[in-house]
């Protein structure tokens, strides 16, 4: 796990969206310079490869729900179904993602009935179900209790290690995130400074 810390307005979300490949095709803006992520120039993956390789979970979970499902299970299935995976594979991914995020009890609930913290965990489950090589979490713990954050960080750390995936956390506060990261950076004045 890698963490990038920064104050409000420091550019954390912009950097997260750039890493996710959202610029310039999905968000307006001008990019100068070049960079690579997962051995590919940023923003050059075809959409189907991008969604299967990189997932971004943002701070506002309600904006990331599809709006076209009637249960948490259907919401978590939405991404893998769009990859045209076999039904058995989709169900296995749903089960694993719901278990990892402690969302099994929410499986048959309508997404509109969830609390903020529950919705945040479901959106993370949706990203996990895509089995990305890179999972970007942009203040994705903001609505979780400290206990839920610790539990999820431990499970995500194990998940990333087992899969060989990279998780990049974008956060304002270092606690408890710094304890789970192999590298940490401070984003300030448009530059990244190493913390450890």
Give residue ranges: language-model regions.
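ABC ATPase NBD coupling module
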Residues: 30, 40-55, 82
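Q-loop/switch helix immediately C-terminal to the Walker
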Residues: 60, 68-81
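Conserved ABC ATPase "signature" region
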Residues: 77, 88-106
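Conserved ABC ATPase signature
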Residues: 110-114, 118
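Hydrophobic anchor residue at the start of the ABC signature
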Residues: 124
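Conserved catalytic motifs of ABC-family nucleotide-binding domains
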Residues: 131
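ABC-family nucleotide-binding domains
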Residues: 145
């Amino acid at each position: 796990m890698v963490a990038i810390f920064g104050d409000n307005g420091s550019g954390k979300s912009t950097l997260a969206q750039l890493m996710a490949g959202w610029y310039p095709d999905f968000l307006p803006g001008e990019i100068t310079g070049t960079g690579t992520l997962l051995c590919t120039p940023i923003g050059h993956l075809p959409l189907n490869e991008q969604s299967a390789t990189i997932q971004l979970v943002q701070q506002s979970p309600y904006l990331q729900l599809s709006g076209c499902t009637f249960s948490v299970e259907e919401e978590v299935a939405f991404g893998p179904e769009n990859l045209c995976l076999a039904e058995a594979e989709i169900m296995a991914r749903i089960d694993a993602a719901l278990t990892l995020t402690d969302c099994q009890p929410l499986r048959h609930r309508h997404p509109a009935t969830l609390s903020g913290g529950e919705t945040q965990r479901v959106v993370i489950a949706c990203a996990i179900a895509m089995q990305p090589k890179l999972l970007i979490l942009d203040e994705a713990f903001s609505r979780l209790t400290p206990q839920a954050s610790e539990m999820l960080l431990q499970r995500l750390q194990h998940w990333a290690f087992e899969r060989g995936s990279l998780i990049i956390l974008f956060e304002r506060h270092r606690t408890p995130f710094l304890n789970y990261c192999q590298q940490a950076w401070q984003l300030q004045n448009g530059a990244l400074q190493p913390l450890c």
